[in-house]
Amino acid sequence: MTKKRVALIFGGNSSEHDVSKRSAQNFYNAIEATDKYEIIVFAIAQNGFFLDTESSKKILALEDEQPIVDAFMKTVDTSDPLARIHALKSAGDFDIFFPVVHGNLGEDGTLQGLFKLLDKPYVGAPLRGHAVSFDKALTKELLTVNGIRNTKYIVVDPESANNWSWDKIVAELGNIVFVKAANQGSSVGISRVTNAEEYTEALSDSFQYDYKVLIEEAVNGARELEVGVIGNDQPLVSEIGAHTVPNQGSGDGWYDYNNKFVDNSAVHFEIPAQLSPEVTKEVKQMALDAYKVLNLRGEARMDFLLDENNVPYLGEPNTLPGFTNMSLFKRLWDYSDINNAKLVDMLIDYGFEDFAQNKKLSYSFVSLGEEKIGKFN
């Protein structure tokens, strides 16, 4: 039987470029372990260009990236408006895209728009699901409207931020808040703030990443929980995982970028999280509800905060969960008796299924007729 060709895309121009490479390595190995697919790899360099497959294989093997990119760029006609994606065409046809691009391009809907334009199946959520979920402010608005508990927040831009002094923030949200760039992932552009000086610095930092910034209340005694969700119309939810860092209960520690991807030796992981049956049921249901409200398909990770009274708050969704050796998403499915090879096989099947469903939808239009719309000279 002819193997289906899977285009594994990784890298990108976000601050999570290197994380994407590590996730892609594990996805590559998992896809290969199924013995069902031919894998074609495409790295997206930090300059936004898709690299040819041979160069991409070297980068996936963690060879020094910049010389590889420099050599590739010498072969590119940069005057061609489609030069950035020319490598896709030169690799021939493939059956499905498997994006592993964290942050910009991969999680904001950009790549999904390209896949839709090319009329090809892909793994994961549709463009609108990615775009909405990547915007933390818009996500919280949708969660709130649909009755899914989340933390209190304020959204500011560079102009309206002047109306929110630190004293006003404290009165509204409390004396510990998190300041976040609205459209970033993996704790990039996020600061924990406890005073006016930190608040000013945090706003300045977050506005480097986005023109929209979220200011969010801290949750007292918070435990951080993660839940994996996979599927389309009838999604599956994983066991719940928990992680704590030193001083997290007092509010002095939190699960930041360093703890996620650089050094997690101080992080305590717990799978399954030790929760009451009632809280476990509520968290899983909230995860499923959010998955549907945000129009997610294929895969997602839902992050929660559990307060000192064991009340869960949905933090944010991640529509393209990390799959590094440190990633809890990967471990959650292992614990749920779905190993890596089985997981990627299911994700690929979900991609084909969603594509087939969308093909049944009508995109036809009714002509208004020349006599109604007039002629153009």
UniProtKB/Swiss-Prot annotation:
Cofactor comment: Binds 2 magnesium or manganese ions per subunit.
Cofactor(s) the protein requires to work: Mg(2+); Mn(2+)
A Pfam family of this chain: Dala_Dala_lig_C
Keyword DNA repair annotated: no
Amino acids binding ATP: 170-225
Glycoprotein in keyword set: no
Gene name per UniProt: ddl
Assigned keywords, A-Z: ATP-binding, Cell shape, Cell wall biogenesis/degradation, Cytoplasm, Ligase, Magnesium, Manganese, Metal-binding, Nucleotide-binding, Peptidoglycan synthesis
Catalytic reaction list: 2 D-alanine + ATP = D-alanyl-D-alanine + ADP + phosphate + H(+)
InterPro entries reported in the protein's UniProt record: ATP-grasp, ATP_grasp_subdomain_1, D-Ala_lig_Van_CS, D_ala_D_ala, Dala_Dala_lig_C, Dala_Dala_lig_N, PreATP-grasp_dom_sf
Domain of life: Bacteria
Classification lineage: Bacteria, Bacillati, Bacillota, Bacilli, Lactobacillales
Homology family: Belongs to the D-alanine--D-alanine ligase family.
Cellular component GO terms, alphabetical: cytosol
GO BP terms, alphabetized: cell wall organization; peptidoglycan biosynthetic process; regulation of cell shape
Pathway participation: Cell wall biogenesis; peptidoglycan biosynthesis
Occurrences of domain ATP-grasp (ranges): 140-349
Assigned EC number: 6.3.2.4
Binding of Mg(2+) 1, residues: 303, 316
Gene3D superfamilies to which the protein is assigned, alphabetical: 3.40.50.20, ATP-grasp fold, A domain (3.30.1490.20), ATP-grasp fold, B domain (3.30.470.20)
Record's protein name: D-alanine--D-alanine ligase
A GO term, aspect molecular function: metal ion binding
Localisation: Cytoplasm
Binding annotation for Mg(2+) 2: 316, 318
